[in-house]
């Protein structure tokens, strides 16, 4: 069977069976059908908000999913595609659909998509290029398991969690973790990680390694206390206005609320990011030390890497 045709009066199809036809190349729908429409041989809902079926033997190498698509039905619609090489997903999906066991070589995931779902690209053994734009928040378990041709991937800022075995049995040897990730679940020990220092290494009873964000609070004369970074509910400046002399330095200090309770002491800056509005007036280091370069004013923004919470300090250089 190479073609499947939906007549005008048909309002329901056995989609699970339809998506199991290995030889299917094209789907056609009568123009006056009330439930479905087809475009380039692909089956959608009448309003084109749902993708129902992409023929497994469709000869096209490139598929740009229409931006109108908000949902891909879980009837193996994009699984085990034989000829598709380049896939661009709709920006209006909430998560990536299942595309496992397909011939895909390149996939583009728009930043509006919240996450890469569990096993989405499992066993896509020709997949060698993954483009992810900023906005992705999570990658679930085994998302790229057995993608042996995948040798590198750039993870975007804003990513918060990486699940179990996401990059197991891929070609990835090194991986840079952005400074927004809160947790990396069990990861292949053979992968060399370049990660933020606030991600601490832990071992499960099984011996599996995982990483989790920790926030350290230091108070004068007391032992430093460490909390899960996910418990931070607010950060604020010790002082919101600073005046320094040209050529002099001072260090910004951050107060922190854990589970809505203000703690004594100051937050270790390793989990913070510092930026200045005027680099010619004020220089700021990764540890929060500011230096007055010339007379003027600047605003230093302090951001909690894991959630994006911020506060601002107004700096005047005399």
List the predicted regions and their residue ranges.
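Small side chains
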Residues: 107, 114-115, 165, 237, ...
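Structural signature of tandem-repeat unit edges
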Residues: 1-41, 46-71, 79-94, 102-115, ...
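Extracytoplasmic soluble-region selector
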Residues: 156, 228-318
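Consensus positions within tandem repeat domains that build extended binding/scaffold surfaces
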Residues: 75-76, 117-120, 141-143, 163-166
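Non-catalytic beta-sheet/beta-sandwich ligand-binding modules that flank or precede catalytic cores
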Residues: 208
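Hydrophobic structural packing positions in well-ordered secondary structure
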Residues: 43, 121, 211-212, 274
């Amino acid at each position: 069977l190479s073609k499947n045709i939906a007549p005008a009066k048909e309002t329901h199809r056995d989609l699970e069976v339809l998506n199991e036809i290995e030889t299917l190349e094209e789907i056609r729908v009568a123009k006056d059908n009330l439930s479905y429409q087809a475009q380039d041989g692909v089956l959608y809902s009448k309003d084109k908000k749902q993708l129902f079926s992409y023929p497994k033997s469709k000869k096209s190498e490139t598929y740009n999913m229409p931006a109108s698509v908000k949902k891909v039905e879980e009837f193996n619609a994009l699984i085990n595609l034989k000829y598709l090489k380049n896939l661009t997903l709709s920006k209006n999906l909430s998560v990536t659909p299942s595309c496992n066991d397909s011939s895909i070589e390149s996939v583009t995931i728009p930043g509006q998509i919240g996450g890469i779902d569990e096993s989405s690209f499992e066993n896509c053994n020709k997949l060698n290029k993954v483009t992810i734009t900023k906005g992705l928040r999570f990658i679930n378990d085994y998302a790229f398991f057995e993608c042996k041709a995948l040798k590198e991937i750039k993870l975007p800022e804003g990513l918060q969690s990486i699940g179990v075995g996401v990059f197991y049995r891929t070609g990835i040897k090194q991986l840079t973790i952005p400074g927004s990730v809160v947790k990396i679940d069990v990861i292949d020990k053979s992968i060399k990680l370049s990660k933020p220092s606030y991600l601490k290494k832990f071992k499960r009873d099984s011996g599996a390694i995982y990483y989790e964000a920790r926030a350290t609070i230091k108070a004068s004369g007391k032992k430093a206390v460490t909390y899960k970074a996910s418990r931070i509910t607010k950060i604020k400046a010790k002082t919101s206005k600073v005046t320094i002399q040209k050529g002099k330095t001072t260090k910004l200090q951050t107060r922190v609320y854990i589970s809505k309770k203000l703690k004594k002491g100051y937050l270790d800056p390793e989990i913070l990011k510092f930026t200045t509005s005027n680099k010619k007036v004020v220089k700021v280091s990764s540890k929060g030390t500011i230096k007055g370069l010339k007379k003027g004013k600047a605003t230093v923004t302090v951001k909690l890497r894991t959630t994006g919470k911020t506060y601002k300090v107004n700096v005047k250089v005399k």
